[in-house]
Swiss-Prot record:
A divalent metal cation 5 binds at C34, C36, C37, C50. One of its GO terms (molecular function) is zinc ion binding. Coiled coil: none annotated. It comes from Balaena mysticetus (Bowhead whale). It comes from the Eukaryota. GO terms for cellular component: cytoplasm; nucleus. Residues 30-61 are annotated as: Alpha. Keywords: Acetylation, Metal-binding, Metal-thiolate cluster. Monomer. A divalent metal cation 3 binds at C15, C19, C24, C29. This is Metallothionein. A divalent metal cation 7 binds at C50, C57, C59, C60. One of its GO terms (biological process) is cellular response to zinc ion. A divalent metal cation 1 binds at C5, C7, C21, C24.
């Protein structure tokens, strides 16, 4: 389980704006939920999908 979320590590979940998931993939989340979003990315506020490290996620795609 992700210590900061209600989903299994490596699994996917729907996160609230205050979520701080780190071990799972957020299928629906706000900027504060995605630790892989680079700072200053304007598109992050519109939601993103984290798939791993910052160089492997499409938060700003």
């Amino acid at each position: 389980m992700d210590p900061n979320c209600s989903c299994a590590a490596g699994g996917s979940c729907t996160c609230a704006g205050s979520c701080k998931c780190k071990e799972c993939k957020c299928t629906s989340c706000k900027k504060s939920c995605c630790s892989c979003c680079p700072p200053g990315c304007t598109k992050c506020a519109q939601g993103c999908v984290c798939k791993g490290a910052s160089d492997k996620c499409n938060c700003c795609a």
